[in-house]
Amino acid sequence: MAASTAGINPYIHESWKKVLINEFTAPYFMDLKQFLVAEKSKHIVYPPGNAIFSAFNHTHFNNVKVVIIGQDPYHGPGQANGLSFSVSPGITPPPSLKNIFKELNTDLGIPIPYTGNLEPWADQGVLLLNATLTVRANTPGSHQKKGWEHFTDAVIKAVSDHKKGIVFLLWGNFAQTKEELIDKDKHFILKAAHPSPLARGAFFGCKHFSKTNKILEHQGVKPIDWRLE
């Protein structure tokens, strides 16, 4: 199995390999690997190779409770760490993430953190999934439609098919296109505007963090501690 992911990252957790084994051997994934090898020979690609599958290594398949869907990794130096909306330690939170923290503050009274590193959420079962897992430096959208969306759609479908009671947070029009992949009879879908400032504050007041925890608690599942510090 390691050979099938060589050139990208052989360190995706075994729990995911079991449910995604057909993806790693599919022709589109071979093409994606070749594309990434060519990209890396000419350009800087984010996140670093060892972080491409960070979302899966922090949130094992068996531990998924919540899924937050993003679009692309951040394309600035040092920002992307493989988790949607998250940035590496020491990096100033981008505007969308700042708005997420503002909503957390008004929803649950959680102080706005200094860090934008969301690994503590991922470690508790929040799958922070970008639809596209890589990007060329300073070139947003550059790795779209190269195969990643096929792979991450399969991830969403696998979670939907094999699990139940998962809370999917779909923020913005793009994330909401993924609703068709989710079995609404088995899972919970919460929708809101994107936290980007371009949405002119429409994200605020969604209370998705408290709503998520109420859903989890109602099922007898330990809620998420959304605090980062």
Give the location of each predicted region.
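A polyanion-binding, active-site-adjacent surface
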Residues: 10, 22-170, 174-177, 182-191, ...
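Generic N-terminal amphipathic, Lys/Arg-enriched alpha-helix
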Residues: 8-20
